[in-house]
């Protein structure tokens, strides 16, 4: 029994109302003289494609926002000394669009005092495709077709391709089962897999990693689940 896609269209049915990407601001505070060195809030949860913006609230010193493994580094040219690196200066901002993962970061100017975490789950939805399926007929030269809806789980872990030298790892499992690798160091941003059986709970996670390194990676994203 063959299958033919009708119109080539893939219809995406989001389980939740779609929302525009948003921006979350984190303040980078304080200096070594007056104290108060911190990122506030130190831990945030955002969605794939959201922007995190850091604002330097201090009047004197630079700050940076740097992923623990150097996967990304938001700094600047202000305030460098022989003892300290430069960063983004008082009153200025830096920002980044985020992919799925649990990303720990710190300030390179104040590495002991300033740390933060950004948690981003993968985005999951149900998609469907209309296909024309050939039905067997007793007379070989008579072809009959019927329309069938095929359902898919659609997984999105990033809104953009990663920077050069980076890639994404993606794993899935049925609830309670073993994790299975579905992508390794990919530069792609999404996938879909066909739903063969209904009423199954699928769980997925992803992370950002330096290609060629097993350890230079963000943490896995918070668990995301969907019922097929």
What are these regions (language model features)?
Residues 20-151, 176:
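Extracytoplasmic copper-binding redox domains, predominantly the cupredoxin/blue-copper superfamily
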Residues 9-19:
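C-terminal segment of classical bacterial N-terminal signal peptides
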Residues 1-6:
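Bacterial N-terminal signal peptides that target proteins for export
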Residues 16-18, 50, 215:
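N-terminal low-complexity, intrinsically disordered patches enriched in charged
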Residues 16, 113, 225-226:
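Short hotspots in intrinsically disordered terminal tails
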Residues 122-228:
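Low-complexity, Ser/Thr/Pro-rich intrinsically disordered linker/stalk segments at domain junctions
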């Amino acid at each position: 029994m063959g299958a033919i896609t009708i119109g080539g269209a893939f219809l995406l049915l989001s389980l939740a109302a779609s929302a525009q990407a948003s921006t979350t601001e984190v303040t980078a505070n304080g200096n070594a003289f007056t104290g108060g060195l911190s990122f506030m809030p130190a831990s945030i949860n955002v969605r794939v494609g959201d922007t995190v913006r850091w604002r330097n609230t201090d009047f004197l010193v630079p700050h940076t926002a740097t992923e623990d493994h150097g996967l990304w580094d938001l700094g600047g040219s202000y305030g460098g000394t022989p003892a300290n690196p430069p960063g983004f200066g008082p009153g200025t901002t830096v920002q980044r669009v985020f992919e799925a993962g649990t990303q720990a970061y710190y300030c390179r100017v104040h590495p002991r005092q300033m740390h933060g975490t950004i948690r981003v789950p993968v985005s999951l939805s149900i998609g469907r495709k209309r296909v024309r399926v050939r039905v067997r007929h007793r007379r070989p030269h008579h072809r009959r077709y019927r329309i069938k809806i095929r359902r898919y789980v659609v997984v999105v872990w990033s809104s953009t391709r990663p920077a050069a030298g980076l890639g994404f790892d993606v794993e899935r499992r049925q609830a309670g089962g073993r994790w299975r690798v579905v992508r390794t160091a990919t530069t792609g941003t999404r996938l879909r897999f066909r739903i063969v059986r209904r009423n199954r709970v699928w769980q997925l996670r992803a992370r950002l990693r330096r290609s060629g390194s097993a350890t230079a990676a963000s943490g896995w994203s918070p668990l995301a689940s969907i019922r097929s």
